[in-house]
Amino acid sequence: MENNKKKLILLDLDNTLICAEDLDTVKDKKRLSQAQKQFRTVRMEDYYDIFERPHLQEFLDYLFKNFKVGVWTASSKDYAIFVIKNFITAPQNKVKPDRKIEIFLCSHHCNVSKKYFKGISKDLKLVTDQWKIIDLSQVKLVDDLEKLANHQPENVIHVKPFFYDEPNSKNDTELLKVQKTLETFK
């Protein structure tokens, strides 16, 4: 499939692809230590431990093969770049796979969206109507915020939020479900 004909998938980061634990507020250090053994974890300086959602790399391989991929997160720019570099474009310090982020939107862009679109932090009309980057029928947002899915039901794929410390989180298959859903969008 030619890259210029591929549709666009925008990915949220926190609780969609990864889960971050603020190291200053950890209450159960034993549980954190156990989770570090169960999940691929990357420490961002002494601020956060960031946990990879199960099946993330398989999911990303599928996305980059079949779609243009972008990120739209409510997180700060620096934090988002750290997550992208460590989990999306160069995972596990391996040779960088052929993964290029087509569009990168962060907290600033969420604020712009709220300004233009009645308080909705990730209204896709910002990229389709306001900036005219892509047609609305050619884009999907994968996000854990149900509010976004309710606002844009045709364009948002809602995922169950990922928390590393929830029971059975190691067996999470949410990204595989999204992959199956996207088969009909290609």
UniProtKB/Swiss-Prot annotation:
SUPFAM superfamilies, alphabetized: HAD-like (SSF56784)
Record InterPro entries: FCP1_dom, HAD-like_sf, HAD_sf, TIM50
Protein name (database record): Putative CTD phosphatase-like protein 355R
One annotated GO molecular function: phosphoprotein phosphatase activity
Protein role: May function as a phosphatase.
Keyword vocabulary terms for this entry: Hydrolase, Protein phosphatase
PANTHER family: DULLARD PROTEIN PHOSPHATASE (PTHR12210)
Annotated SMART domains: CPDc
Family: Belongs to the IIV-6 355R family.
Superkingdom in the source lineage: Viruses
Domain FCP1 homology: 2-182
EC numbers on record: 3.1.3.-
A Pfam family this chain is assigned to: NIF
Class of the enzyme per the UniProt entry, highest EC level: hydrolase
